[in-house]
Amino acid sequence: MKTSAQQAIRDIQHFGEEGGVVPVIDVASTSTFMDPRDMERTFMGELQGCYLYSRHSNPTVNIFGQKVAAMEGAEAALGVASGMAAIACAVEQIFRNEGGSGGHIVTSRTVYGGTYALFKNIFPTRGLSVSFVEATDLKAIEAAIRPETKVLYAETLSNPLLAVSDIRAMAALCKKHKLKLVIDNTFAPMMVRPLELGADVVVHSCTKYISGASDFIAGAIAGTKEFIGSLIDVNTGVVMLTGPVMDPRVAHELYMRMDHLGVRMKAHSQTSLFLAKNMAKEKLPVIYPGLETHAQHGLLKTMIDEAIGYGGILTLECADAEQARVLATKLQDEKFGLYAVSLGFSRTLMSCSAKSTSSEIPESERKEIGLAEGLLRFSIGYTGDDQVMWERFMKCYRSVVR
């Protein structure tokens, strides 16, 4: 029987001191060697498994990594300081491992705005060129591949347009052209396991669903033991040498919260589907991958754990940015949600993507990819009564959109 992400997380078990049911937090920045020669061998890469310095490795961060690895079906995982650190370090490490002399990346035109800015404005200064293509068009992806291409980067569900990546097909392309497939699974933890579908590396912004409380900035990278080990190599590891490490206190808190991540994701999904179905009945311009009317609903259905559902993100297109602002203000006043970026919080968060998390993408390109100025992205929470929240939503919507 295949082990679900929920069961895999459940089976990670660490005891605290004196048999405590909660593991201790190890906040030491440096560790003692009983034999000076062991320190020397560690620095030379001859001795593995020793704690040296917390920029290299930390026991509490490591046990959090074990839970992320269990969730993703990975050999190993590493917690880092943020989701952007996870993306940057994972991609740069691949190029370092492949020779480190520059190269080329193919990615989606509809990625998160911060990712777009990193790829467009920072990576080229480091010798990495990037082609942005339509991620749902496999022919366009293959046409963009060059001899120097090393990475295909995509999101399980694109942010904010909710296009679904065909990870199996992408993996086949990567195998054919000897590329590494990196998938940002931030929108779909517990729902989708990209590594099982053929991806090589998975990254997360743990700030979102894994935290669930909008109180930490954190990220994670999952993959093979060899790849995760390369990230913290004392001589060539991008995480080790650039330093975006996870605080052990954050790692401990996230380790504990992952036990109920599955319960939370189910609740996000259930409420989102309820609201999306009601919006669809009212013929509102809603996009949610759990609706059968979504262009790639069938594809996503072949990838998800249906016990978890289709996630907690939906979008609604308003006439323009001003109408979106007015609607969001009314919704906040009526306590439907909070006008704030990010996602994965227990309460609903709303933002106008073109004016916030996708503002890094030039307006001309936003028009080309269909990201309307009035698009409202909702990260649906699970607190309160669904029917009451729906009634509040429609009261506000009808007062704005007549």
Task: Please report, for each region that a protein language model flagged, where it lies by residue.
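PLP-dependent enzyme catalytic core of the Aspartate aminotransferase-like
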Residues: 75, 120, 129-131, 322, ...
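Conserved small-domain helix->loop->beta segment predominantly found in fold-type I
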Residues: 273-347, 361-367
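N-terminal "arm"/small-domain region of PLP-dependent enzymes with the aminotransferase-like
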Residues: 1-58, 66, 376-379
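A common structural junction motif
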Residues: 239-242, 331-344, 395-402
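Short, well-ordered beta-strand elements within core beta-sheets of diverse protein domains
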Residues: 254-263, 311-319, 377-381
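Short loop segments at secondary-structure junctions
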Residues: 30, 223-227, 318-322
